[in-house]
Swiss-Prot record:
Origin organism lineage: Eukaryota, Viridiplantae, Streptophyta, Embryophyta, Tracheophyta
Name used for this protein in its record: Unknown protein from spot 168 of 2D-PAGE of etiolated coleoptile
Misc: On the 2D-gel the determined pI of this unknown protein is: 6.3, its MW is: 48.9 kDa.
Length: 22
């Protein structure tokens, strides 16, 4: 899931990655 979120993060703007990493 983190890998998939990382890819979306690039398109979204580090929004999903922030919540996922937290």
């Amino acid at each position: 899931i983190i890998l998939e979120l990382a890819a979306v993060d690039s398109a979204s703007g580090k929004l999903l990655i922030n919540g996922n990493f937290k």
